[in-house]
Every structure is written in structure tokens, then in C-alpha cells.
Amino acid sequence: MTENTHETAPNTADTDTADFDTADTDRADGAADVSTNTPNETGEAAIPELVIISGMSGAGRSTAAKCLEDLGWFVVDNLPPALIPTMVELGARSQGNVARIAVVVDVRGRRFFDNLRESLADLEAKHVTRRIVFLESSDDALVRRFESVRRPHPLQGDGRIVDGIAAERDLLRELRGDADLVIDTSSLNVHELRAKMDAQFAGESEPELRATVMSFGYKYGLPVDADLVVDCRFLPNPHWVPELRPFTGVNEEVSDYVFDQPGAKEFLNQYTELLQLIAAGYRREGKRYVTIAVGCTGGKHRSVAMSEKLSARLAAEGIETVLVHRDMGRE
């Protein structure tokens, strides 16, 4: 299955800003808000699956949590880390009614972080299946988001927003290294973030491997969350063909032009074969997701056309694919 997200990310991070979690960053009292879903009426008692959502304030933790809630997860927001094992135990006593728990953890102090490490060690000792999803974003994007909603960063104190961001990034550095999934939302709007979450968690049975194919423009920077990067700048640029310049790689005229160039089809065929080899290795290593970044100069023509074809090829090979055109609308 291929999911196309042709909505393009603007060069500022203020789209749907309120749907990212800057609005929740002033809740430092540790009070837990519990969002419940209708439980199943069947099922035996079992240890529930656990996802821990954390990351930078303003990077989209609340959006990620809402996505999981929509997918039927039992979501607990702003839960003190020390209570995570208790929540899992309560889920295990629910006789199968709570099979999947997502916990949003807001680590704002050293003691909170120590409690989280202790809780993770406790869960590991009890053989609880857990995943850590870490949401991050660039300093510039986070500053724009906080400024757009006119809220201070929870850790800035009497300083500036950038001071709070720096303090939080340093505090979360170790947790980011332990994360199973890191999502950079610097250039994503909320719809694209939801698409990424859906790619990882949607469906009753998860596929063996899920891929995000993302076209981008080198002039706007490499996607920081890319696992593999493809450079399409070896192909002639449709930008210099006047009748093609207004179009994008989604349009048939541009796609035909790109794949009529020497080496284009051969590259697509050989790279698809290479990805099949890599995918087999990822499966053996237990890797569940991969982000493939496909770049050209501006992210409008060549990379878009190649990403369209590549995502279709991967879907035909049984790899569930999300297609994102990061920079297609910037020029």
C-alpha cells in the first residue's frame, strides 16, 4: 500500500502550529491526562504493547499521541516516568481490554530522567515489549513555533527560548540515542507527521518493513532523518526547459522527460534491486522502518518523478510505503 502525501512542507514551521505540542508545554505539574478508547470485549490477560513518546517540546509529541489514539491505542499524556510500570501492570490486569498503551513522557528535570531510566530497566526485566518514539526539530523551527503561539519554552526560565531549547536538547541527548524511531518534524506539517506515524503503527498486523520515500531539494538541506540518500542531479534538469518549468515531477510531462533521459530507467531498476537486497538485510536485523531521501537541486522535478516511481516499485514488492514531497511547493 502506498500513501501519497503531496501536501508540501513550507519553509517555515508555522503550519498548523497549534497541532504540535507547544500548547501543552506549560504543564509542568506532572498531572496525567488519560485519553481512553473503547476497550475490546474479548481477549485474555496479557502484558500490553508499550510505546513511549518523548522528544523536544514543540516537535509534535501531542500530534503523535493523537494519531495513536485514533488508531485505538490507550494514550496517557504527561505521565510521570516512575508510573510507567504501574500503567503497564494495570493494562495487564485488564483481561486483554488494553492491549496497546502509548505514554507521552515530558522529561524536564534530571530526576524525571533518572526515573525514566529506572522504569525502562524495570520493563526490560519483565520482558515488556516497548518502543521509544523521539520527536525532534531544528532550533529555528522550534523557535518559530513557540513564537507563533506566544508561549515560553518550559525550560527557558528568565532566559530566551533558545536557552530553553538548548537545555532540553542536552537533557534528552541520551534518550534520543536510545530511541527506536526518531522523527524530525522541522519541515513537516501535522498531516505529514500523522502519515509517518500511520506508516509505523497503522493496521492490525504490521508489515515486515515500512518505507518513507521523501523527495527533497539539496538547496534546502538534507533530511536529517534519512537512512538512505539518492542523488538525482546526474539527470538533466527540467527546470531549464521553459515549457516544463511550471510543472512538477508529479505531472506526466515532467516524468516522461526525466525517464526519457539516458540512465534514468536503468538507475531506477538497479536501485530498486539494491533496495530489495537492503530490505532483506533490514528484516533479518529486525529493522521495521526506513526513510529513503531522493534529492535534486530544488526538490521539484527530478527527485519528485523518481520518488513517484520508486515508491510504486517498493509497494509492488510488498513494502508499505509513504510518499512525501518535502520541497515540491517551495519554488
UniProtKB/Swiss-Prot annotation:
It comes from the Bacteria. GO terms for molecular function: ATP binding; GTP binding. Residues 1-43 are annotated as: Disordered. ATP binds at residues 55-62. GTP binds at residues 106-109. Keywords: ATP-binding, GTP-binding, Nucleotide-binding. Transmembrane segments: none annotated. Coiled coil: none annotated. Belongs to the RapZ-like family. PANTHER family: RNASE ADAPTER PROTEIN RAPZ (PTHR30448:SF0). Displays ATPase and GTPase activities. This is Nucleotide-binding protein SGR_5570. It comes from Streptomyces griseus subsp. griseus (strain JCM 4626 / CBS 651.72 / NBRC 13350 / KCC S-0626 / ISP 5235). The lineage of its organism: Bacteria, Bacillati, Actinomycetota, Actinomycetes, Kitasatosporales.
